[in-house]
């Protein structure tokens, strides 16, 4: 399986995670996944920094800007690693196998694709 296919599977997992519940992503995790996704998909920041009153957009832009110079492939690898690390941490507190039976089956399939 190619890096792009693994990355696409990881992105789909994040997109399909329930918004609430035991495996909801924190704001910091969302910011990490956002910035890595942008770097992996587009590369270095290609827009102006949002204004001071656009707090959320500015945080997202700053997080992406911090990845400047990271290759798109490296960003994809980091995205997949961040997802794997997140599930490792979740597994310390939750029976992930049982949880996976209750949610979108695509998540379970895609976790297997990325080596989880």
UniProtKB/Swiss-Prot annotation:
GO molecular function: fatty-acyl-CoA binding
Residues the entry annotates as binding an acyl-CoA: 34-38, 60, 79
Regions that span the bilayer: none
InterPro entries named among the record's database cross-references: Acyl-CoA-binding_prot_CS, Acyl-CoA-binding_protein, Acyl-CoA-binding_sf, FERM/acyl-CoA-bd_prot_sf
Pfam family membership, one: ACBP
Keyword Nuclease assigned: no
CDD domains per UniProt: ACBP (cd00435)
Superkingdom of the source species: Eukaryota
GO cellular component, one term: cytoplasm
Keywords: Lipid-binding, Transport
GO biological process, one term: fatty acid metabolic process
Domain annotation ACB: ranges: 3-92
Role noted for this protein: Binds medium- and long-chain acyl-CoA esters with very high affinity and may function as an intracellular carrier of acyl-CoA esters.
Family: Belongs to the ACBP family.
Protein name per Swiss-Prot or TrEMBL: Acyl-CoA-binding protein homolog 3
Organism: Caenorhabditis elegans
């Amino acid at each position: 399986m190619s890096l792009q296919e693994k990355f696409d599977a990881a992105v789909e997992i994040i997109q399909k995670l329930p918004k609430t519940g035991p495996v909801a992503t924190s704001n910091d995790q969302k910011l990490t996944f956002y910035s890595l996704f942008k770097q992996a998909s587009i590369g270095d920041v290609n827009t102006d920094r949002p204004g001071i009153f656009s707090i959320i957009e500015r945080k997202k832009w700053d997080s992406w800007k911090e990845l400047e110079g990271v290759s798109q492939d490296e960003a994809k690898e980091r995205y997949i690693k961040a997802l794997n690390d997140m599930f490792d941490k979740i597994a310390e507190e939750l029976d992930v196998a049982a949880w996976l039976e209750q949610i979108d089956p695509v998540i379970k399939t895609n976790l297997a694709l990325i080596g989880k």
